[in-house]
Swiss-Prot record:
Limits of the N-acetyltransferase domain: 1-120
Family named by the database record: Belongs to the acetyltransferase family.
Domain of life: Bacteria
Protein name, as recorded: Uncharacterized acetyltransferase SPy_1546/M5005_Spy1274
Length: 142
C-alpha cells in the first residue's frame, strides 16, 4: 500500500473513507491546487461494493469539505468508464480525451462555491484569470 502514496499525501491531502462495519470500502482524496481550485484523486470503491452509492458518498463528503474551505471549483481526471458517474454528480467534461497508462481519460470540473457579494476582490481576479487561461487554452488547441 505504501507505493500508492506520494509527497502530496503528507502535506496537502484530505481523505474521505466509507466503511462497511470495520472494513473500508470506498475512499477518495482532496488535493488543493490553488487558493480557489482543488482536485479529487484516487476515488476508489471495492468491486464488491460498486453500485451501492459509496463512491458518491465519498465524492459528496469531499465536495462538502471543499465548499467549507472556500474553494471555488473541483476538478477530476477520470477514466472514461467513470465519466458518466461524475457527470451524474454534476461534473462537466472539458478538454480533449487522452490516453494514460493504456486507458482513455477525461478531465471534468464542477463549480462548488457560487459567487457571493462578500467574496473578496483577490478571489474574483483569480477566477477571471483562471477562466481566461481556460479560454486561451481552448482557443489555441481547437
Amino acid at each position: 500500500m505504501a507505493d500508492k502514496f506520494d509527497a502530496n499525501d503528507e502535506t496537502r491531502t484530505v481523505y474521505a473513507v466509507v466503511y462497511d462495519n470495520d472494513q473500508p470500502v470506498s475512499t477518495g482524496q482532496f488535493l488543493a491546487e490553488t487558493k480557489i481550485e482543488a482536485r479529487l484523486t484516487r476515488i476508489v470503491t471495492l468491486a464488491d461494493y460498486c453500485g451501492c452509492g459509496y463512491g458518491a458518498k465519498v465524492t459528496e463528503a469531499l465536495e462538502t469539505y471543499t465548499r467549507r474551505e472556500g474553494f471555488y471549483q473541483l476538478t477530476i481526471h477520470s477514466e472514461l468508464t467513470a465519466q458518466t458517474f461524475y457527470e451524474n454528480l454534476g461534473y462537466q467534461s472539458y478538454g480533449p480525451k487522452c490516453l494514460e497508462d493504456g486507458e482513455y481519460c477525461q478531465s471534468l470540473a464542477k463549480t462548488i462555491l457560487k459567487w457571493e457579494k462578500n467574496m473578496d476582490i483577490a478571489m474574483l481576479i483569480a477566477i477571471v484569470g483562471g477562466l481566461l487561461g481556460c479560454y486561451l487554452y481552448l482557443t489555441k488547441n481547437n
